[in-house]
Amino acid sequence: MASVSELACIYSALILHDDEVTVPEDKINALIKAAGVNVEPFWPGFFAKALANVNIGSLICNVGAGGPPPPAGAAPPGGPAPPPPAAPAEEKKVEAKKEEFEESDDDMGFGFFD
């Protein structure tokens, strides 16, 4: 996870980008100082240099999930899928549970008008 210093610089860069301002070191420092965050002195310069030639808008729009999609015909990692369980037995159990639930709906414990 990112440190507080890194997050402060990232948020400062995003604020500056949102205001359509370039992201130089002095403006990152000004925002961090205004927020009252203590940051090691190398972080603002590091982020300013890293973001100097980067289109931050496209960077934000192209954030991915972190990995390539699986191949189209690939089998699941656990091997072939097991056959589905017998559906009629499950339906009977569900119906029995529904009946119990419906019976308990009649008496909700509100004896105000009895």
Curated annotation (Swiss-Prot):
GO terms, molecular function: protein kinase activator activity; ribonucleoprotein complex binding; structural constituent of ribosome
Modified residues (N-acetylalanine): 2
Gene Ontology CC terms: cytosolic large ribosomal subunit
InterPro entries to which the protein is assigned, alphabetical: P1/P2_N_sf, Ribosomal_P1/P2, Ribosomal_P1/P2_euk
Cross-link (Glycyl lysine isopeptide (Lys-Gly) (interchain with G-Cter in ubiquitin)): 92-93
GO biological process: cytoplasmic translation; translational elongation
Family designation: Belongs to the eukaryotic ribosomal protein P1/P2 family.
Described function: Plays an important role in the elongation step of protein synthesis.
HAMAP family: Ribosomal_L12_arch
Protein name in UniProt: Large ribosomal subunit protein P1
Species lineage: Eukaryota, Metazoa, Chordata, Craniata, Vertebrata
